[in-house]
């Protein structure tokens, strides 16, 4: 399928991909006869590059007087491709040394001398760059269009969606009754008394349904059970794939609650974004067992610095990339999750079984209390750490007693660190704890976990910690779709906000989530409940995530054409900051603020890629394309935040995207999208990291802290 845009008209030629080269050559002949002639008159690729460079430079000189910014940007883009052609780059995520031959391939293609198998996707991308050079198009975001695109996506609070899910719940309850009847687990609290009627069993399951422990106990753990609970609606192809996954040892874990969010009816809502989170792809199953850690700093070796230069305690409890923040993964049920996300960034840890769903084995041992005290000393004795992110797995998977102990240990550590600073002079004082975060997807996966007792623990900790200088308390959650925002999720969100914590959302920008208007609708839906958005993450690019991978160009397109209608005016940001920190009920306050300022939502999130060992950034240039048409991006780190000094020792950072733009558009077409709505995607070949919203900045200290870094070895 060749995807060519010409004068805003989409021409789709239905041919097999491998046979499209000749047809694509005819398109070049018709559209760019000058380029074909230039190639044919060049003896080799070097002469072609020299001639093309001279032509582009001459064109640039002519255009400088006209201030034609779009065309000039494209011209510089093509010059970058020429500059990097016939070079090698070290790809950061894989460590491979890769040749860059973009313009050489173009010359071979135009002269009929392709030496290697090269995908048409490469030449489709280049076609659009030359088309933009000749016909630059100024992108004008359309608010009315974005509103229409947002209206496509229902939420879990819509009456029609709730009605379908009530029917799902009835079906699943019937399945649960059969499951409990077949179980032989005398120790389980979820069993039926002898001789009770079906109606009594049904009433008991309805009662249990409202407790998180029931859903975890009854989680679906096999493909056949999954199909049973989904009314035998899975295809033979899907069942075969899931059977292969099980044979390879991939864990399955889906709660009845989350399963009730799927739609197995022929009518009703599109559940692809939710479904793709629990259904595995061929690529994921193929690579499971050989998946590598994308987060290179997560690979910890005793007495050796990690990839970011930080020395860490032995084991896998503390992960660190930046000077100010470290992640704590407790030895508890927090190493499990409420479900296994198919695009999980820690799939490597599930593969190694450091993260798993064996709840009994994950319960804290007596030695954990001692270990926790030792881990807290790391935070206490570090000169720069002022932010702790407790995650996993999932922080809220820890039992209440365990979570209370962890938070108490954090509190005592913060007290000691503050006390120690009293004897340190100005300029030598250590960073004190200012921010505590709990990373959890349970607000989407299993909001029933948010009980009165849990809320009480959060409220009590905030009150105590606020008195010793901790001022930021965040639940860092992960809603992927507005369909996950259910009445149960709303109740959980309201309870946590009432306890004084802020809830921030991180989205993974999968293919289904990247559809026009989808992310904008999610922001709007969350804002209405008082949740503020934090990051929109590009999917990390190893092969296991090929099926869900969205190119960074689409993320940039979303930010500049959709998220722009949630851009908070600079003069209003202080008001929004105060509202998020202090005003309740936050949802109603946010809705009023958005309406008063003509915003569709609050676009407080940053669209970024998490780079191995370096951190979050969207500052890059496209310097080439692989033979498969995948873009080769040259990244720079986010200059707006502090990094490990190792950043100064690292060379240039190159990342190869997981999928070509053309392949992504074909995938969108296969799931029913009108790809004409995405036609400006080819314009986005370079990015710049967005500024951070003020609520995500650390507050200033009332003293001068040291610049010295401890626990660092370069």
Model-assigned labels for residue ranges:
Residues 254, 310-349:
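N-terminal pre-triad scaffold of radical SAM enzymes
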Residues 373-380, 396-568:
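Conserved AdoMet/S-adenosylmethionine-binding subsite of the radical SAM
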Residues 336, 347-388, 401, 405-408, ...:
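Conserved alpha-helical substructure of the radical SAM core
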Residues 4-321:
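Flexible, acidic/Gly-rich N-terminal and inter-domain linker regions that tether
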Residues 320, 331-335, 349-360, 439-440, ...:
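Catalytic or ion-translocation cores adjacent to nucleophile or general acid/base/metal-coordination motifs
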Residues 254, 559-714:
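C-terminal accessory regions of radical SAM enzymes
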Residues 15-40, 56-60, 64, 91, ...:
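Radical SAM enzyme [4Fe-4S]-AdoMet core and its adjacent flexible, acidic
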Residues 322-326, 340, 382-391, 434-439:
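Glycine-rich, often proline-containing surface loops adjacent to acidic residues and nearby aromatics
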């Amino acid at each position: 399928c060749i995807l060519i845009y010409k004068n805003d008209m989409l021409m789709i030629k239905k041919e097999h991909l491998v046979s499209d080269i000749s047809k694509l050559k005819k398109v070049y002949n018709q559209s760019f006869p000058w380029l074909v002639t230039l190639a044919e008159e060049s003896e080799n690729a070097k002469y072609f590059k020299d001639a093309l460079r001279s032509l582009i430079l001459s064109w640039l000189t002519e255009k400088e007087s006209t201030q034609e910014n779009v065309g000039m940007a494209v011209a510089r883009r093509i010059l970058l491709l020429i500059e990097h052609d016939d070079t090698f780059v070290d790809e950061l995520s894989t460590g491979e040394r890769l040749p860059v031959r973009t313009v050489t391939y173009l010359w071979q293609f135009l002269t009929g001398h392709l030496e290697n198998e090269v995908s048409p996707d490469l030449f489709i991308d280049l076609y659009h760059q030359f088309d933009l050079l000749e016909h630059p198009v100024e992108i004008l975001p359309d608010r009315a269009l974005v509103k229409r695109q947002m209206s496509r996506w229902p939420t879990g609070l819509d009456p029609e969606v709730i009605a379908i899910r009530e029917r799902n719940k009835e079906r699943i309850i019937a399945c649960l009754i059969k499951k409990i009847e077949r179980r032989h687990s005398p120790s389980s609290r979820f069993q039926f008394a002898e001789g009770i009627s079906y109606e009594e069993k049904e009433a008991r399951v309805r009662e249990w349904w409202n407790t998180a422990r029931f859903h975890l106990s009854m989680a679906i753990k096999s493909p056949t059970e999954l199909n049973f609970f989904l009314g035998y609606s899975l295809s033979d192809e899907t069942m075969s794939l899931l059977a292969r996954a099980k044979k390879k040892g991939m864990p399955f874990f889906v709660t009845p609650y989350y399963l009730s969010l799927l739609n197995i009816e022929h009518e009703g809502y599109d559940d692809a974004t939710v479904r793709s989170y629990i259904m595995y792809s061929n690529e994921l199953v193929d690579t499971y067992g050989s998946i590598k850690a994308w987060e290179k700093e997560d690979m910890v070796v005793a007495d050796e610095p990690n990839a970011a230069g930080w020395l860490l305690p032995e084991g896998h409890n503390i992960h660190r990339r930046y000077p100010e923040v470290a992640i704590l993964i407790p030895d508890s049920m927090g190493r499990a999750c409420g479900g296994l996300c198919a695009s999980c960034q820690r799939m490597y840890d599930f593969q190694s079984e450091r993260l798993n769903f064996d709840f009994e084995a994950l319960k804290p041992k007596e030695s954990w209390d001692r270990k926790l005290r030792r881990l807290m000393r790391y935070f206490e004795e570090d000169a720069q750490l002022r932010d702790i992110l407790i995650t996993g797995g999932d922080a809220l998977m820890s039992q209440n007693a365990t979570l209370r102990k962890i938070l108490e240990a954090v509190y005592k550590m913060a007290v000691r660190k503050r006390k120690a600073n009293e004897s340190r002079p100005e300029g030598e004082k250590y960073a004190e704890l200012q921010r505590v975060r709990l990373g959890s997807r349970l607000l989407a996966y299993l909001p029933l976990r948010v009980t009165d007792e849990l809320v009480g623990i959060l409220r009590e900790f905030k009150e105590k910690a606020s008195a010793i200088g901790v001022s930021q308390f965040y639940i860092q959650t992960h809603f992927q779709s507005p369909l996950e925002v259910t009445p149960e999720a709303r109740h959980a969100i309201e309870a946590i906000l009432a306890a004084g914590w802020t809830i921030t959302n991180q989205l993974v920008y999968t293919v289904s989530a990247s559809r026009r208007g989808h992310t904008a609708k999610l922001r709007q839906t969350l804002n209405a409940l008082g949740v503020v958005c934090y990051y929109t993450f590009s999917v990390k690019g190893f092969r296991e995530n090929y099926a869900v991978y969205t190119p960074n160009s689409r993320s940039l397109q979303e930010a500049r054409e959709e998220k722009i209608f949630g851009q908070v005016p600079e003069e209003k940001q202080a008001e929004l900051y105060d509202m998020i920190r202090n005003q309740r009920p936050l949802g109603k306050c946010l809705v009023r603020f958005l309406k008063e300022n003509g915003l569709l939502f609050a676009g407080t999130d940053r669209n970024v890629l998490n780079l191995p060992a370096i951190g979050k950034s969207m500052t890059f240039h496209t310097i080439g394309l692989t033979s498969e048409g995948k873009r080769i991006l040259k990244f720079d780190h986010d200059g707006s935040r502090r990094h490990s000094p190792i950043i100064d020792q690292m060379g240039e950072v190159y990342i190869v995207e997981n999928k070509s733009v053309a392949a992504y558009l074909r995938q969108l077409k296969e799931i029913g999208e009108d790809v004409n709505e995405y036609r400006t995607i080819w314009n986005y070949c370079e990015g710049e990291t967005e500024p951070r919203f003020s609520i995500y900045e650390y507050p200033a200290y009332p003293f001068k802290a040291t610049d010295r870094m401890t626990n660092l070895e370069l």
